[in-house]
Amino acid sequence: MYPDGVCRVTDSYYTKTVQFQDINYQLNQNEDKTAIFDGWCDFLNYFDSSIRFQLSFINLSATRDTYARRIAIPLQGDCFDKLRTEYTGMLQSQLARGNNGLIKTKYLTFGVEADSLKAAKPRLERIETDILNNFRRLGVQAEVLNGMERLRLLHGMLHMDEPQPFRFSWDWLAPSGLSVKDFIAPSAFEFKTGSSFGVGSKTGCVSFLQILAPELNDRMLADFLDMESSLIVSMHVRSVDQVKAIKTIKRKITDLQKMTIEEQKKAVRSGYDMDIIPSDLATYGTEAKKLLQELQSRNERMFLLTFLVVNVADNRQRLGNNVFQAGSIAQKYNCQLTRLDFQQEEGFMSALPLGYNQIEIQRGLTTSSVAIFVPFTTQELFQDGKEALYCGLNALSNNLIMVDRKLLKNPNGLILGTPGSGKSFSAKREIANVFLVTNDDIIICDPEAEYGPLVEHLHGQVVKISPTSTDYLNPMDLNLNYSDDENPLSLKSDFILSLCELIVGGKDGLMPVEKTIIDRCVRSVYREYLSDPRPEKMPILEDLYNELRRQDEKEAQYIATALEIYVTGSLNVFNHRSNVNIENRVVSFDIKELGKQLKKIGMLVVQDAVWNRVTVNREQRKSTRYYIDEMHLLLKEEQTAAYTVEIWKRFRKWGGVPTGITQNVKDLLSSREVENIFENSDYVYMLNQASGDRQILAKQLNISPHQLSYVTQSAEGEGLLFYGSVILPFVDRFPKDTELYKIITTKLSDLSEQTGEEAKDAITE
């Protein structure tokens, strides 16, 4: 093994290994499956007879501790450690439901014959580049393993019984006089019985697949890989030279024709119809001609395939069960899994990803027959970074979904779902998760007063804004870092135009003249503050009103009159300087009691206050998570929608992670401009959808009918997750016996149960 990943397997045979990731295949509709299948056929046809290659699918068990460490939330020595411990326990119980106990990896090893390493390297590098490009065309992520990574992989396969770390350095070879084999070899090998083998304390068995079926199914390989036990599937494939393959088949056809003539002569001599020939002979002749036609005119090549399955277990009884299960899968598809008696050592060595086949049991197959063993099933999303958040279980594999939105190009997100689909619960669960594992600030716009109990439990601050409240937010607040521009007034003017549109605009919005007047007045009222930026000089809505009154245009008087009720009238809740301290890490703006007239204005003012907070946090290199419930209310008026879209775009650059929560998809897609919210959101958590919304979303997000079924009449907490280019169906069954569930549930039945339990406790006391 060389540091660059080239391995000299024999004196004249050199190989390299590429690791590739999974993509969604089983979830796709038939057209997409066909496209992937055709792409995989083209991939296989790339390999000519001079290149041998091996596909390795390695499912090895990891200890629960390995995964537990990856999902554990570190304790921080504060009053929330009890909640962190509970949340970690919840993640571990969810982990136990899936088969995350297996680490599943996929590799392609390719090799060439060459006289020397120097001669082999250029060829291997060219093939490597072509393979990576072919994977890219399929939408598959792939990377080449270097020497250290290949040795670590081999070490893991040879030490399945002991999770000891791989220790090795290239610098150790020369002084020690050892070879790389000494660093990866297990404590013991045993190949005594002929029908099984031992490696360390594990016992295993190598079998080969006899392909007897006239037609194969693309589920076969997936079913092998879905087994919940340690397993290695190895496919050694070698292309046959096209000219030789055609000559061989033509020769077979000639031989069959000779045999047919002999049979016909025999029939004439015996006095029966010469057309009556053995059925096998007729079948073979037809199949041979069909095969010749495929090779000559259908872009098919001939391959020789050796299909090996290695089962590994702790003891012979468990091994027998695993082998029986694998054999049942083969029989289901009219094939047979046969043990390699007295070839266990050769079989196990052939299963290692070295690209070297010592088993001479081969089956001739065309390109499409080899390609039916599609190496893709379903994509997994399990990111183990310290800020990865729980999103449920993969509905296809039952594995944990853990993602870090900050790793996306655009972390902005949407939570979409009909009432009762689990929309609010999902948002609250994410908020709690963010609070426990990150240091990000969390701000919530709460139009229905749903988030108060959670915020209070997290020692956050609920700012109640209503006509009767004494909590005030000044819509004219301006942070000097409000915009990237030298003049922060540009973006602030946009906000005040949006505010005035909600107040004045009516059906047609603000007229150009009105916009000009408002912009002029805004610049005037901020002049004093910008020259001496002290809090007491911050303008309020009344200053804008007075400035409008001083203008000569009749439009200015019209705008001022429209503003009057919000300045001196009964709706003057926003005509005060801010008196709330919103520096708490978790802040919720409760605007439920603002009423229909003021609610949209309240949401817009909250959005502006959040933007001020984002600009402050940016200076401190701190992220701000913003959750906007009932977001569709901000998207109905043109100017307000335009401002919201602008803020949505700016959030990413300023360290903001906004999440819109809504049931009204139609409003989200009401105009081309608002569609930008979708285009600037790489994270969509989609729960059950109404039929009209499903069709809109299918078109907007290019969702297949099969994928759409996961958001059609789906139960609470079930749906589709869009994370960048990945689409996964998920199921979130959050344990009801946890303290966190009781805090975040909005179901009346759960709340009444809690009340009943509290009453019982009181009686008992």
Regions found by a protein language model. Name each.
Residues 1-378:
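Extended, folded cores of ATP/NTP-driven motor/assembly subunits in large transport
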Residues 23, 30-49, 56, 60, ...:
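P-loop NTPase motor domains
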Residues 415:
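Hydrophobic anchor at the beta1->P-loop junction of P-loop NTPases
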Residues 423:
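Conserved lysine of the Walker
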Residues 426:
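Hydrophobic positions on the alpha1 helix immediately C-terminal to the Walker A/P-loop
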Residues 433-443:
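Post-Walker A helix-loop "phosphate-sensing" segment adjacent to the P-loop in P-loop NTPases
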Residues 459-463, 673-686:
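A short helix-turn-beta junction within AAA+ P-loop NTPase domains corresponding to the substrate/partner-engaging
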Residues 701-756:
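Conserved P-loop NTPase
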